[in-house]
Amino acid sequence: MSSQADIIKPDSRIVVQFSCGAASAVAGKLALAQYGDTHDVQFLNAYLANEHQDNRRFLADCEVWTGRKITVLRDEKYGADVLNVFRRERYMKGRTGASCTKLLKRRLLDTWKRPGDVMVLGFTAEEEHRLDDFRERNPDRPVIAPLIERGLGKEDCKAIIARTGIELPAMYRLGYEKESAA
């Protein structure tokens, strides 16, 4: 595996994949702290029509916390709607992942990326296998995972957000592990 020094070049954009969850918020804040003075750090969000409306409040709160505008991208083909993807594609999850993630998030984000971009993913210490799977499926896509690098788990991220005074998204308060269906 390459080191960050091998992955991140002086002209790389650092692109945070912001999902409106605690982990991606903390991963983005850590990336901004580490690279904000030397690189163009961008925050991107793929809007989902089916997500809880409180995610937009959390996104706005995180814009204030990070001091950065979060660019929101919206799929047009499927209306940013997970159910439309399932109806048209006729599967939920295959060997390469969930169809909604691929079509409503990854493909959309791919249209925005530039060569040399380094993705920041909010995989937590408990999700190292997801990072390994991602790297295996995307060997040409440079990616860093600040939470795994620092041994931070889901509960750590929730606690960090709580200490900022930002209220966690409603889906957490309703008892779900994540802010989305993914």
Roles of regions detected by a PLM:
Residues 1-182:
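Nucleotide-activated chemistry modules centered on ATP-dependent adenylation/adenylyltransferase
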